[in-house]
Design a protein with these regions (language model features):
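A detector of single, family-specific signature residues
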Residues: 2-470
Length: 470
């Protein structure tokens, strides 16, 4: 708490003695307060102009805030040549703000060489979408005014390597969706013609294609199936090419290989996580990472009513959440602490909430593994070696005679021993939770309880095999 002498009717030192028992009190001299205010104004004035850009596909609306006034400055064509010309006309002390869009990062890359700083902001932080009057000119002015007032916090800017991985993963996602649509079209033909379920497991494998070719269907249906099969073959080759590039990049990433030591995590999950997060050390704790990924529950509380948890916030990358949930489904089917955690939450809240909680637990586990630079303690070396060898083959490494996954997959005794160790880790986790629940203090009658909490931190000393285990 700080106040200026003369602001109250009581003497400032007496008022400070009365307040210091409740809050921290600092008595500020008027000259010192004036000096701080003048310093902030001089700093803003020396920072140059604040420029807002409302970026469109064909043009950018420009607005400039200077000396407390905001004015429009026309439009600039969204081409590299015109943006370079526009950037060369700016002062090196200027600052530029623009909203996240498809071309925002390329515009920022061109302008950042000419100005002091380029800030790319989230549309949710500007309030432009909720405005009653919305035009390109007003949007640019709003960005310039907020930037001049220092109320804009730019989103994290990924490096070029991270952007390339994001684009490749997005390309793969679109190709997989197109392949699924082509397969569904063939299934629709079979349903439409009252054809029973295929007698093979993989309808689009060798036996499945042979079965499709032997069906007696009208000519137009046969043409549809043939066209879809050719389209699927083309998409398979495109997906394989993209996955080869992703695998080559993953082999050069120590972080992706470290995440793949966790059972259930493949290269797509690890690459999607790293592409969405980037530098893990910019998150101070696992909770910040969970909130960034949108896996934290929304909390509702008002008045004397207890706080209640709602659905997850779903902020951040949807593809990263999807990858974590898919990895969680695979992880909970294998013995280990993750399986025990899923079973415990499912018994109370159901499988839907339990699998999302498991995905959240995976995100926390990833944070510990990456910040401590260590592999997962409960990994199964044979499965890890198999995943890494398949990753090398997918990246284009030559195959050798013998099993395609190496000697690890052929030693049944070794794999059985690894599974037994995983089962022991799961039992250790269950004992830890049981001891923690027995030693936890009982809730007082009438105390507010926040539902939706999947787990809490165990007491000190009651750990399983590694503190990074979920």
């Amino acid at each position: 708490m700080g106040f200026e002498p003369g602001s109250f009717r009581w003497p400032p030192l007496r008022l400070a003695r009365l307040c210091r028992e409740h809050v921290s009190v600092v008595v500020v001299s008027p000259l010192l307060l004036q000096w701080f205010t003048q310093s902030e104004e001089d700093e803003v004035r020396s920072a140059g102009r604040a420029i807002g850009l409302d970026v469109h596909r064909d043009f950018c609306e420009v607005a400039i805030a200077q000396d407390g006034e905001v004015r429009s400055a026309g439009r600039v064509d969204t081409t590299p040549e015109q943006l370079e010309l526009f950037g060369s006309s700016l002062d090196p002390r200027d600052r530029v703000a623009l909203e996240v869009s498809g071309s925002a990062w390329e515009v920022a890359r061109i302008l950042e060489r000419h100005v002091a700083r380029v800030i790319v902001v989230s549309p949710a932080d500007t309030g432009i979408r909720q405005a009653r009057a919305k035009t390109d000119r007003l949007d640019a002015r709003t960005l310039a005014r907020l930037l001049a007032a220092g109320e804009l916090d730019g989103v994290w800017s990924p490096d070029e390597r991270c952007r390339v991985m994001r684009r490749r993963l997005s390309r793969r996602e679109q190709l997989v969706r197109s392949r699924s649509r082509a397969k569904n079209e063939i299934h629709a033909v079979l349903v439409r013609r009252l054809v029973g379920r295929p007698p093979v497991t993989d309808l689009f494998g060798v036996k499945g294609r042979r079965w499709l070719s032997e069906l007696e269907l009208p000519l137009e249906e046969i043409e549809t199936i043939g066209a879809c099969l050719r389209h699927i073959e083309f998409l398979d080759s495109e997906i394989a090419a993209v996955e080869r590039q992703i695998a080559s990049e993953a082999l050069r990433s120590a972080e992706i290989r470290r995440l793949m030591t966790v059972p259930g995590v493949n290269v797509i999950c690890a690459a999607s996580f790293m592409a969405a997060v980037g530098e893990i050390r910019r998150f101070q704790n696992p909770r910040a990472l969970v909130a960034y990924l949108g896996l934290d529950p929304r909390v509702y509380q008002s008045g004397s009513a207890p706080a209640t948890g709602g659905h997850i916030s779903k902020q951040g990358s949807a593809s990263a959440r999807w990858a974590l949930v898919e990895a969680a489904w695979s992880a909970v089917r294998q013995p280990g602490p993750q399986h025990a955690f899923y079973q415990r939450v499912r018994a109370r809240r159901g499988h839907g909430i339990a699998i999302v909680a498991s995905a959240r637990k995976l995100a926390c586990l990833f944070w510990f593994l990456l910040t401590r630079e260590e592999d997962y303690a409960h990994q199964q070396p044979s499965l890890t070696a198999k995943k890494l060898r398949l990753l090398e083959i997918r990246a284009g490494a030559p195959t050798v005679k013998g099993t395609p996954t190496g000697v690890w997959a052929t030693r049944q005794a070794m794999r059985a021993g690894e599974r037994k160790l995983a089962e022991q880790a799961e039992a250790s986790y269950k004992r830890m939770v049981s001891d923690w629940q027995a030693a936890a203090p009982k809730k007082k009658a009438g105390a507010s309880v926040t539902p939706g909490r999947a787990s809490q931190k165990p007491s000190t000393g009651k750990v399983a095999r590694q503190t990074t285990s979920p």
